[in-house]
């Protein structure tokens, strides 16, 4: 099926949100699975709400997610002549007509239909009037008066609509601009799109678009409508559920492979498997495993999954990724230094922001170590400071200041004074890092270096 063509068609009226990102991922995976093409189209016909900054943001998010597209980027705003040529074709073939009914009258028709318990729709007053173009006039599709539209949805199975409930939809507005459904059908057909995967909030558009495909003599693509992503409370996902735009997840310190993995699993499954490399997703993805029931967004699970990818990433790559977050904390440090630190700290973070923060005490000079008051009160007692001074003397005379040497120096002090490790280690740990937590003490000491460690111990003794 190398002739498979899918598309993603966002509107640049906001940043790319996770629902749109999931749609893009599904279409990208389907195209890549079959060795087909993935088209990216910017639906910017709403000139009042469309902004270049949002287009730029969407493109940046697509690239960050690793979703490349084939061919040129398509802008609907540059294709009005093409849309109008197809509208003219529909007028010439009798599948469309001019309508002069003003919007307030059309709304009145719909209210009258509602009052009778009918679907609110235009009553077709101008269908047989043979009007031509004129100020304030629109072009409408002449929909069949009866019949059913039935199609095999890739997710929902057989779906049917009663044609009598459909409106004679507007194809060209009074200002000459084509409408959404007309532009989408013309674009998908002329670009050879074979499969349309989208959210089920678009399901009501599908019968209208099928009528247009039929009127224009185009072959129908396969449609698949995936359920919307819900919040943990099973209501429509929103920011109050912790959902963010893709750009916010990037700024928050998530890894793109984690977000892709998570969003794919919100609507697609392959047995009980949770973690997939991108290449594995391309290999295994298929519409037959798209879920017909809505999935709930779980920010904690996303955090867990991101933590997994943090720990699977090589130290060198993770250092490169966390570098800008460390810089945002105010530190000028090179990636090679971070590559030494991240193996110690990535178990203690689930995102890059957290990783940068938990390494902070390793990057400040001794004079700027921030001490936790409770930890100081508990560990740096008079006895605790005496142990810190003793360990300091043992460390100062080490020949090689490495992990093994630091560990032996602490051990020798403990053994030589008839003490237990738990009597000494907490005080030394607080002296070095300012708090009780952190990775192994000898590991941190070795990475800090002799001068820094001794300076930290001296400062703690003087508290």
Curated annotation (Swiss-Prot):
Gene Ontology annotations for the cellular component aspect, listed alphabetically: cytosol
Position of sequence motif 'KMSKS' region: 236-240
CDD domains hit by this protein: GluRS_core
Cell compartments where the protein resides: Cytoplasm
MF (Gene Ontology): ATP binding; glutamate-tRNA ligase activity; tRNA binding; zinc ion binding
Catalysed conversion reaction: tRNA(Glu) + L-glutamate + ATP = L-glutamyl-tRNA(Glu) + AMP + diphosphate
Motif 'HIGH' region, chain ranges: 10-20
Chief location bin: cytoplasm
Alphabetized UniProt keyword annotations: Aminoacyl-tRNA synthetase, ATP-binding, Cytoplasm, Ligase, Nucleotide-binding, Protein biosynthesis
Residues reported to bind ATP: 239
PROSITE patterns: AA_TRNA_LIGASE_I
Pfam short name (any one): Anticodon_2
Entry's EC annotation: 6.1.1.17
BP GO annotations: glutamyl-tRNA aminoacylation
Family membership noted in the UniProt record: Belongs to the class-I aminoacyl-tRNA synthetase family. Glutamate--tRNA ligase type 1 subfamily.
Function: Catalyzes the attachment of glutamate to tRNA(Glu) in a two-step reaction: glutamate is first activated by ATP to form Glu-AMP and then transferred to the acceptor end of tRNA(Glu).
Subunit structure of this chain's protein: Monomer.
Name of this chain's protein: Glutamate--tRNA ligase
Organism: Nitratidesulfovibrio vulgaris (strain DP4) (Desulfovibrio vulgaris)
